Each structure stands twice: as C-alpha cells, then as structure tokens.
C-alpha cells in the first residue's frame, strides 16, 4: 500500500513534560512533544513520534502545512485512514 496517503489534522503542544499522543479533539489529533517550538525542533519531534507510533520510517510522515503554527496538517504515506486510526487508538486507549 505504498501509494496510499492520509492527511491528518494535528494540534501540537510543544515544550511539554513528555512526548505523547494525547488523544482526539473532534477530528484533530492532539500531540504533546517535549521539544521546544524553535528552529523546527517540535516539528521534527512530531514527525518522529507519529512515524514511530504508526510503525513507519520518518520519511512516511511529513508536515505539509502549519510548520510555524500549533495546528498542522500531516501527510502519512503507506497506511490507509482506517489503519492510521486503528494504530492511534491502540496508544490512546
């Protein structure tokens, strides 16, 4: 399913005490990262956390808009929307 791509709206809280997938706020995924919101550190942390959580390489997860905003649009390549939601629900509980 390499050609499959999902766009995922995300709200990020940078500078948190720990990095985690915090849950859903409507259709928007809430993510907390310990990295600060400076020089792309929080964006890189978001991409790495999502890639690890979804079992993808870091190249499979990219922020496509909102790089300087807490609200971002993330592209996930290689998984269907159902697979993304299932894997996220496993860590959110």
Residues of each region from the PLM?
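Contiguous, often N-terminal, cationic amphipathic patches that form binding interfaces
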Residues: 1-48, 53-58, 62-68, 72-93
